[in-house]
Amino acid sequence: MGEYTISKALNNNVIICTYNNQEVILIGKGIGFNKKAGMTLDESASIEKVYKLEQKQQQEYYKSLVEIADEDVLQAIIESVNFITSTTHTTDDKNLVVALTDHIIFAYKRLKQNQIISNPFAIETKHLYSDAYAIASQVIDKLNQRLDVKFPPDEIGFIALHIASNTEDLTIHEMSLINKLISKSILIIENDLNHEIDNHTVQYQRFIRHIQFLIRRLNKKEYIYAQDVFIDMVKNHYPNAYNTAFKISKMIQKHLNIPIDDSEIVYLALHIYHFENQISSSHN
């Protein structure tokens, strides 16, 4: 049976150890109580999590977070990570634990100082990552109860992005960019149609999904192609929708620095035409 040699106890629940000549982080309730450097733990100790953070910078940052964190907050974070991984059936959560520790520690600090940050992309996140959003909602409920606080609803969207990044083939940066481009696309449509888009409709959900997969295709250099006759038909029959789609394509192109083909623009135009129809129907 292997042994962990303690390098440092960060607090009662987190210790830094060496195991097989590698530095690891052990997490467990009370695992660091009265522990000192040089002591050993065997694998039968009450260890909840073992993290081997490959990047030295990531290791040092996590240590610095744990050292400034209130122990109740840290335990609530550990419970949140355990809940997320068991609910999503994921095992590789070392990036999630660092990201959530970072986010929740500072969100809690802001809350105590009455500094509330709004989430401009909460609606997009809820629609695009509905499963992660539902789990995040439960996480916030548990944190509120555990820490006797009331996090604002916008925090659900922030936590959802961290959960989704651990279960989907996307980074937080990529998801945030997708949300930003969707929001800008909707603004372009609303300006051109002079009408607010209802974000509760099936059409809205289909459109933002289309934008999401468009951006993912472009980043992976995967392209779709439409026949010239179809492209001409859309341009001629739905000129306003095509014009709006063209504006959106130019905006996305500017952000991604990737050219967008006419085939992609006409499929965008069809979605926009459905919005036009929806608005016309509501006026009749």
From Swiss-Prot:
This is Protein GlcT. One of its GO terms (biological process) is positive regulation of DNA-templated transcription. Keywords: Repeat. InterPro entries: BglG_antiterminators (IPR050661), CAT_RNA-bd_dom (IPR004341), CAT_RNA-bd_dom_sf (IPR036650), PRD (IPR011608), PRD_sf (IPR036634), Transcrpt_antitermin_CS (IPR001550). It comes from the Bacteria. Transmembrane segments: none annotated. Belongs to the transcriptional antiterminator BglG family. GlcT subfamily. One of its GO terms (molecular function) is RNA binding. The keyword Mitochondrion does not apply. Residues 65-173, 174-282 form the PRD domain. It holds the Pfam family CAT_RBD.
